[in-house]
Amino acid sequence: MSQDRKPIVGSFHFVCALALIVGSMTPFSNELESMVDYSNRNLTHVPKDLPPRTKALSLSQNSISELRMPDISFLSELRVLRLSHNRIRSLDFHVFLFNQDLEYLDVSHNRLQNISCCPMASLRHLDLSFNDFDVLPVCKEFGNLTKLTFLGLSAAKFRQLDLLPVAHLHLSCILLDLVSYHIKGGETESLQIPNTTVLHLVFHPNSLFSVQVNMSVNALGHLQLSNIKLNDENCQRLMTFLSELTRGPTLLNVTLQHIETTWKCSVKLFQFFWPRPVEYLNIYNLTITERIDREEFTYSETALKSLMIEHVKNQVFLFSKEALYSVFAEMNIKMLSISDTPFIHMVCPPSPSSFTFLNFTQNVFTDSVFQGCSTLKRLQTLILQRNGLKNFFKVALMTKNMSSLETLDVSLNSLNSHAYDRTCAWAESILVLNLSSNMLTGSVFRCLPPKVKVLDLHNNRIMSIPKDVTHLQALQELNVASNSLTDLPGCGAFSSLSVLVIDHNSVSHPSEDFFQSCQNIRSLTAGNNPFQCTCELRDFVKNIGWVAREVVEGWPDSYRCDYPESSKGTALRDFHMSPLSCDTVLLTVTIGATMLVLAVTGAFLCLYFDLPWYVRMLCQWTQTRHRARHIPLEELQRNLQFHAFVSYSEHDSAWVKNELLPNLEKDDIRVCLHERNFVPGKSIVENIINFIEKSYKAIFVLSPHFIQSEWCHYELYFAHHNLFHEGSDNLILILLEPILQNNIPSRYHKLRALMAQRTYLEWPTEKGKRGLFWANLRASFIMKLALVNEDDVKT
């Protein structure tokens, strides 16, 4: 039986004991060693190795049959002890003699038949319910428990003065277990209940209600009844039982849970509470049996403000829906909540209704609900969460005549906005609209209440916000989390937006001008998006750094790079890219400036080190080597005595003798000089012609003095005619000193033409360049050339 009782009082224990438990545990919540849990361990006795400083001990759901003083006497700091769901038959409160700080004691759901009491001044919570007591186990010592706030008891029968010892206490909660209660001979018993805020009565779960006890309580705020089974015959017995309990003016809240009854009896119960002072009637786990017919109901003036029915099972499948729904629709109360039921519809009140709050969560309502209804003028809040709504525009049309509606919740339906026909009819009074967890797309923004302040669209199918959206100038909070948006929406159409939730979307490159567009934003939640850490993201991260830290929710932990792979998982706060790699203009200017600097530097170095001269000389050397390898065979077979004939002015003889001859002759190059090799007795012209013919090449040392010499011109003339032919390159010009073309006499047209057509070697004034000059000059001679000695020629 204890297993059946467990769920019955779960919620009551939670409500009544939560404050006490939290208050008791908070001072030592951080001391893990002071909380010991041995529940559900199949223990038959209390463990011996408990820590001496234990403050909270749970031994529930075991097989302990006895509690002795040595078991807990050493736990001097014990404040909470749970022994529920064991096999204890007897309890002597003297075992707690050394536990003077004990505040919470739960020995419910045992087999207790008797107890022995002693003073326990600190006790606040005492639960003796769901045991095997014959009469209420209330000792006179209980009257000294001045701190007691919760008292749980059970008995098979009552006596009027059983609770007299605790009548003067100010209790918050009293739990009476009446599961084992039975009447004898149809007699009616009486019981005076002490003053308490909450009275919870638990009846047998499988028996028809049969309690005949006149209970009276002077000050009661909340009455809770559990396990009520009724039919049409004993329905009146429950109302008789409740008559005395509900008489007091302080009773404002009545809760019935786990109730099985007929529809006729249900209507009678509603009618019973209608004239009573009860303001809040709550019914949980209602099962309707037998038939459902239209029942008469008198909607007189009532103190009832709210009727809440949650979790209804209807065992009647064929019935008049009008008979069922009209009873609720015509109630003249402010708040009606019917949730988790098989109801498929709710009719429109036939006359102007008093409803300001309607909650129809988790039913089977369709798009036809309240269509064309014009009697809900006072309705301020409508909740249709978890139903079968599909057409978004019909939902809008449903609200058209609800002129006071401020809050509408149609989340967790199957709403879609595909069939947009530009007919958008919302109640203009709507301020809060919850459209989350539906199948809406971006077109929903074309049809929204114009004055909405809070809009929840999270978990839909929105990929983008259209440009032609409804201008929602009053919108302050927008939740579009868990959609497929790729960018942060600007505030062009939402000028008053202050809160934006857009996490868990597909935002990879948030707009850098978001914060400029949304000047009033005070809370942004945009984490858990696949941010691409590229140049486009730099400005957004920079803008985040400019706003207050509390504005960006979840920063920086929820803002991480998703791409590229090398940066995946990196916090945006730690992501950095150089300005140069992200600014195209700056990059272009930098590259251009660098190239310009390099060009200027290169030009300067070229000029400073005379690089063009080196290049020119290298090209000449290369060409000379190439031509030397392709000398015609007939050139090599000529009878030659000299490698070179040198023509120069007497003014340049010092350079020829000191520079030219030593550098050529050291490599066995035979040179012909007129003053050294001309044959005396012959004319100068004959010697010139003769030795030019005997030389492989002719070298002319050009200078301003050269062009002033007639003989030098003759030598040049004869060399040009004798050594030059098509394809040959045996004339070498060395420019010792610069010669301007204008300074060459016109009669020396040969020289002028040669200098214009032929490449010549310039004598470098810098000594560092002279090595390349000599290498270039020597490369012009074929070292394997077979020369004939002068003596051999004579013979």
Curated annotation (Swiss-Prot):
Domain TIR: 640-781
LRRCT domain boundaries: 525-576
Name recorded for this polypeptide: Toll-like receptor 6
InterPro entries named in the record: Cys-rich_flank_reg_C, Leu-rich_rpt, Leu-rich_rpt_typical-subtyp, LRR_dom_sf, TIR_dom, Toll-like_receptor, Toll_tir_struct_dom_sf
Disulfide bridge positions per record: 117-139, 235-265, 348-373, 424-447
Recorded name of the encoding gene: Tlr6
Tissue: Detected in thymus, spleen, ovary and lung. Expressed in macrohpages.
Membrane topology, Extracellular segments: 28-584
Cytoplasmic side, ranges: 606-795
GO MF annotation list: diacyl lipopeptide binding; identical protein binding; lipopeptide binding; NAD+ nucleosidase activity, cyclic ADP-ribose generating; protein heterodimerization activity; Toll-like receptor 2 binding; transmembrane signaling receptor activity
Per-repeat ranges for LRR: 54-77, 78-101, 102-125, 126-150, 151-175, 176-199, 200-223, 224-250, 251-278, 279-308, 309-337, 338-361, 362-388, 389-414, 415-437, 438-457, 458-478, 479-500, 501-524
